């Protein structure tokens, strides 16, 4: 794979401000843009340009988050008809609903729409409609956001990822976006990627920093660990940090636990009421059922929540599963991040070189003094990796902005 380094000028915070970037990347063809850091505005660069653009994302949360930031910009979110609960539901979609969604997209294109937001599994419908409407495919650019997820999701969505990969070949212009540099060694083994050029952004050292991750090797249960965290925040004793000699205290905790079963167990054991907690997970029938059972057991209603928008009220505790590991934007000015990993439990296994960087990158506000901080709870005794090797891998892979 050929790699080209593009130096980002000093003072550039978002790449949409980097006016000379378009002179350094292709105007057509397939290529990879390794942005190196999260939160640098890569998708905004493409959504804000004059080109016809299809943003393909692996997660609905990411797409809705982006769509809600551009309500006045005439974007089309495929399969969204104004009913948010319906959009996030992971139940089966009837043939009549599919026809309606396709007709809505068809009308959007007929009326001159140029910005389409889709999940990976909708690329086939999008391509079909563009062809039906005699659109010049050369004029459309597909932006595959967080494309590393194509590989991670293969073990449970192999058909979806393969069909996405096949349909992408029907588009002459495709940009693969990622902040995950380690992918190179794997991409070189794949015919589809090995002949592409990877354009890698090189940021000035003063513009990036390594997150401050407090790594705690522990054999305690998730519930026991959460008990200490919940108690601290309820008593106004959240994490603190000093900035220019002034002490700041966190009043909100974001807890990344990729198991709704464990989240429910924590809420039940620690008597966390709905007013205190936001649960962000995939809207599957199984997860909905677990929250209904929790509601029945405690006598209060718990349901799947939303990512708060800019200016929205944040609850003291937010539990997140992997559905928001990538691409989602949180706008808290004081939230601190906690990450739980356990190699003995498949759902709690994380890739330290990818997932942690993505998770920490979810906090977007520079005014949050805890933006680049996190505590990682892990248990290397349950894996073949030593604690020293774990820490070295983590420190090598992390970079934030």
Positions of the model-derived regions?
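Conserved Walker A/P-loop ATP-binding site and its immediately adjacent core
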Residues: 38, 42-85, 183-185, 260-261
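SF2 helicase catalytic motif II
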Residues: 120-123, 132-166
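Interdomain hinge/linker at the junction between the two RecA-like core domains of SF2 helicases
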Residues: 181-236
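Post-DEXD/H (motif II) to motif III coupling segment of the RecA-like Helicase ATP-binding lobe
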Residues: 149-205
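Conserved SF2 helicase motif VI
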Residues: 344-372
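Inter-Walker segment of RecA-like/P-loop motor cores
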Residues: 73-128, 296-308
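A short beta-strand element within the Helicase C-terminal
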Residues: 330-343
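Conserved strand-helix element at the start of the C-terminal RecA-like helicase core
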Residues: 52-66, 119, 232-271
């Amino acid at each position: 794979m050929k790699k080209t380094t593009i130096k980002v000028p000093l003072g550039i915070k978002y790449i949409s401000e980097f006016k000379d970037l378009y002179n350094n990347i292709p105007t057509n063809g397939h290529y990879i843009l390794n942005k190196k850091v999260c939160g640098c505005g890569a998708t905004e660069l493409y959504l804000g340009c004059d080109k016809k653009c299809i943003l393909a994302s692996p997660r609905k949360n990411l797409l809705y988050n982006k769509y809600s930031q551009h309500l006045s910009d005439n974007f089309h979110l495929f399969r969204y008809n104004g009913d948010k609960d319906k959009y996030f539901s992971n139940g089966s979609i009837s043939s009549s609903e599919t026809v309606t969604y396709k007709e809505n997209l068809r009308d959007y294109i007929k009326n001159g729409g140029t910005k389409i937001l889709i999940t990976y599994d909708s690329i086939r419908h999008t391509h079909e409609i563009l062809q039906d409407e005699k659109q010049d495919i050369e004029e459309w650019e597909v932006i595959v956001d967080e494309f590393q997820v194509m590989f991670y999701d293969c073990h449970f969505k192999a058909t979806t990822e393969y069909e996405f990969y096949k349909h992408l070949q029907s588009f002459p212009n495709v940009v693969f976006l990622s902040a995950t540099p380690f992918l190179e060694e794997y991409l070189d083994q794949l015919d589809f990627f090995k002949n592409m050029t990877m354009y890698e952004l090189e940021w000035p050292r003063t513009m990036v920093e390594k997150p401050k991750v407090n790594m705690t090797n522990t054999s305690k249960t998730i519930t026991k660990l959460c008990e200490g965290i919940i108690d601290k925040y309820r008593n106004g004793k959240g994490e603190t940090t000093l900035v220019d000699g002034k002490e700041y205290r966190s009043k909100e905790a974001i807890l990344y636990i990729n198991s709704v079963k464990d989240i429910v167990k924590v809420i039940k054991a620690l008597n966390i009421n709905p007013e205190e907690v936001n649960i962000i997970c995939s809207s599957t029938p199984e997860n909905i059922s677990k929250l209904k059972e929790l509601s029945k057991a405690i006598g209060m209603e718990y349901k799947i929540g939303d990512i708060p928008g800019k200016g929205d009220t944040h609850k003291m505790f937010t539990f997140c599963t992997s559905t928001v590991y990538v691409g989602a934007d949180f706008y808290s000015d004081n939230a601190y991040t906690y990450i739980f990993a356990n190699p003995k439990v498949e759902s709690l296994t994380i890739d330290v070189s990818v997932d942690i960087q993505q998770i920490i990158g979810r906090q977007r506000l520079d005014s949050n003094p805890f933006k680049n901080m996190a505590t990682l709870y892990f248990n290397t005794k349950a894996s073949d990796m030593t604690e020293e090797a774990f820490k070295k891998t983590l420190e090598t892979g992390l970079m934030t902005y």
